[in-house]
């Protein structure tokens, strides 16, 4: 906590969690915080033990590629205050974990954990209720395979945190679980596609139109799918679920982006309107002129009409995206991470910091 933004990310193929500490402006030093986690895919900072230090919550799949075994794990990397981290497995031998979000779901003042568990044939949305310093009780909220992301916010304005979930596989749906209090939740499906190759790939909570109600951004760009040939699809892109209040949502298509992943809402041009930025994990790199897109900005005109603007055409196969003020100027920078499975193996970048060129 030196006032400079750092980067923490998962190396799923190397079973590691990595910290890029910004030692001085624009200079980062790499430290591996854990190297024996099986396919970690999500990490988030939170003070899980209430000691004033940021710990790290990690969801690990066991293996990234399809598997029905109960090989998922949830870890907390406990920070001792000197930036030394001790791994604690708080859930083991479970269906593959793709997302984990800290939140106090039952209002007892302690952080619980909300999980997206992809599994394969079997998966769940669940939450871990805090019962002690490092002990949790698991509750299943929804039994569906293919969970990609979960999000936590008060979606219906009753003062209690609710849960949203993006489900892929054959379902291709967005679900809402309204918190009724006392650990009880009412599930509903707020949107779904009839296309089993839709490719749901990422979900984030945001207030895109600035009305004070939390909305949902989600992408469809997964190029694995049931089709024989992996790669981008013409229907890939980014969607907005506008929160109308009372648990009701209206679906909007933001725009097309083959291979779309990891959408975020951020005011790129500082005009007071939230824009949308997303990366592309799959593109047609066999195309002769390689006029593909790897980083796309959907500029908001202030009336929730979005104009696509290409920010970059390489590096290829970007799968994750975050934003922040990395240089202390108040301007938004972007951070992307790559995941490389398919050739060609050029135009690669492990982690990239994108800094604004205009004042």
Predicted region positions:
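Beta-propeller-forming repeat regions
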Residues: 1-359
């Amino acid at each position: 906590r030196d006032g400079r933004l750092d980067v923490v990310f998962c190396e799923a193929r190397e079973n590691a969690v990595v910290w890029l500490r910004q030692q001085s402006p624009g200079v980062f030093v790499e430290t591996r915080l854990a190297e024996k986690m099986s396919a970690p895919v999500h990490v988030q900072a939170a003070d899980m033990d209430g000691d004033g230090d940021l710990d790290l919550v990690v969801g690990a799949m066991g293996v990234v590629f399809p598997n029905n075994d109960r090989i998922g794990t949830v870890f907390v990397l406990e920070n001792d205050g000197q930036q030394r981290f001790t791994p604690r497995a708080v859930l083991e031998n479970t269906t593959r974990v793709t997302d984990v979000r800290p939140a106090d779901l039952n209002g007892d003042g302690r952080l619980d954990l909300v999980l997206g568990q992809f599994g394969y044939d079997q998966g769940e949305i669940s939450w871990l209720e805090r019962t002690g310093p490092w002990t949790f009780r698991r509750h299943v909220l929804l039994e569906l395979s293919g969970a990609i992301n979960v999000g936590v916010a008060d979606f219906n304005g009753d003062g209690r945190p609710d849960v949203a979930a993006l489900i892929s596989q054959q379902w291709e749906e967005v679900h809402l679980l309204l918190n009724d209090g006392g650990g009880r939740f009412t599930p509903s499906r707020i949107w779904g596609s009839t296309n089993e190759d839709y490719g749901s790939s990422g979900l984030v909570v945001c207030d895109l139109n600035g009305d004070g109600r939390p909305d949902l951004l989600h992408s469809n760009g997964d190029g694995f799918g049931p089709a024989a040939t992996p790669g981008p699809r013409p229907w890939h892109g980014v969607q907005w679920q506008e929160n109308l209040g009372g648990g009701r949502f209206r679906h909007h298509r933001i725009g097309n982006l083959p291979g779309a992943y990891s959408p975020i809402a951020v005011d790129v041009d500082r005009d007071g309107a939230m824009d949308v930025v997303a990366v592309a994990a799959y593109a047609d790199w066999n195309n002769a002129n390689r006029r593909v897109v790897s980083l796309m900005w959907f500029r908001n005109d202030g009336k929730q009409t979005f104009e696509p603007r290409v920010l970059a055409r390489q590096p290829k196969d970007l799968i994750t995206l975050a934003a922040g003020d990395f240089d202390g100027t108040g301007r938004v920078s972007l951070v992307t991470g790559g995941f490389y499975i398919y050739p060609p193996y050029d135009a690669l970048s492990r982690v990239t910091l994108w800094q604004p060129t205009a004042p």
